[in-house]
Amino acid sequence: MAASSISKRIALAAEIGLAHQDDLHVAMEEIADVIGCGLFAHESIPAAFGYIAAARGRVMDCLYMAINAGDDTDTVACMTGFITGAHCSSRDLSPRYLALIDEVNHFDLKEMACQIDAIAGNTPEA
């Protein structure tokens, strides 16, 4: 099956994001309109990178855009959150949201992160 180049679409999404860093709503709409935010990899992966570029990597801004863009928001928001979360750790996440996630899902994110770090052979940050 023929499909568009994901790497070229990532570059285009990042270009759109960088061009609209001063207006995240416009960035969100442009990325959704030009790139798309659907389930297919050639839309969802570039969209995630476009939101990250637009928001300058700020976790919550990236997530707000990914969630509010429409279409397959859970997929795009998960990728956006994974990428920015891995890059910045938890320092940019609201403690209120972390507590809510733990409470609603009945697990401990911090403990899970420590276990993943241990498996990877890393020393978790305090």
State the predicted function of each range.
Residues 43-125:
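Catalytic phosphate/nucleotide-handling subdomain of diverse soluble enzymes
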Residues 1-70, 121-124:
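Accessory "access/gating" subregions that flank catalytic or transport cores
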